[in-house]
Curated annotation (Swiss-Prot):
SUPFAM superfamilies: Cytochrome c oxidase subunit III-like. The chain crosses the membrane at residues 16-34, 41-66, 73-105, 129-152, 156-183, 191-223, 233-256. This is Cytochrome c oxidase subunit 3. It is found in: Mitochondrion inner membrane. It comes from Pongo pygmaeus.
Length: 261
């Protein structure tokens, strides 16, 4: 091993950024193929490549942090800054979709019938499945906070229980959202309303799936005794991400489901 006189982690060459970029290309191209030609081969290939990349990359990070001790305090500080900047970029990502929605709804054009929702669109009832989804996500925010406090108090059993509850609530939210999509009286091709609705709620749903995956990895780490009350940034980052997803949903519910209907 080469001696280094600093506390920073010098990463070895890794193929996972390249395979991750390849999987992103395959998935986006696969989505276009699915929308236009009803072919899912490319999309499924991209999803498989993405799943394999996530598994290998998370395995490497766990090995470097838990077994090799590369995540020193300066490295953890850098990871915190990185996660904060990542969530900030996500805020601006969703801001673009909200901008598109409000731009179209506050001054509807004659082509939309001069009012919002546009002529011919029957919006979803905000007091049915969307309200249940809101309750589910708020409950998951409580349970992940419970898990965090249990971890800091070295209460292993309660941490596992609370984290498992959070993951199950995330899966339940995803299933409810999928059922809502199937039963929706409009599609993504139904003008500006359909496109902004499905793009915004769809990307939020994707973030819930990513967050649920992130928390599942944290659960496996906790079961393998990787976390301590002082060293658990992986879980902390997942909790930040989950709270961000919660807040985005509240804005989404108030804007698109309640006000927009």
């Amino acid at each position: 091993m080469v001696h280094q006189s600093h506390a920073y982690h010098m990463l070895k060459p890794s193929p996972w950024p390249l395979t991750g970029a390849l999987s992103a290309l395959l998935m986006t191209s696969g989505l276009a193929m699915w929308f236009h030609f009803h072919s899912t081969t490319l999309l499924l290939t991209g999803m498989l490549t993405n799943a394999l990349t996530m598994y290998q990359w998370w395995r490497d990070v766990v090995r470097e942090s838990t077994y090799q001790g590369h995540h020193t305090l300066p490295v953890q500080k850098g990871l915190r800054y990185g996660m904060i900047l990542f969530i900030t970029s996500e805020v601006f990502f969703f801001a673009g979709f909200f901008w598109a929605f409000y731009h179209s709804s506050l001054a509807p054009t004659p082509q939309l019938g001069g009012h919002w929702p546009p002529t011919g669109i029957t919006p979803l009832n905000p007091l049915e499945v969307p309200l249940l989804n809101t309750a589910v996500l708020l409950a998951s925010g409580v349970s992940i906070t419970w898990a965090h406090h249990s971890l800091m108090e070295n209460n292993r059993t309660q941490m596992i229980q609370a984290l498992l509850i959070t993951i199950l609530l995330g899966i339940y939210f995803t299933l409810l959202q999928a059922s809502e999509y199937i039963e929706a009286p409009f599609t993504i091709s139904d003008g500006i309303y359909g496109s902004t609705f499905f793009m915004t709620t769809g990307f939020h749903g994707l973030h819930v799936i990513i967050g649920s995956t992130f928390l599942t990895v944290c659960l496996s780490c906790q079961l393998l005794f990787h976390f301590t009350s002082k060293h658990h940034f992986g879980f902390e980052a997942a909790a930040w991400y989950w709270h961000f997803v919660d807040v985005v949903w509240l804005f989404l519910y108030v804007s698109i489901y309640w006000w927009g209907s």
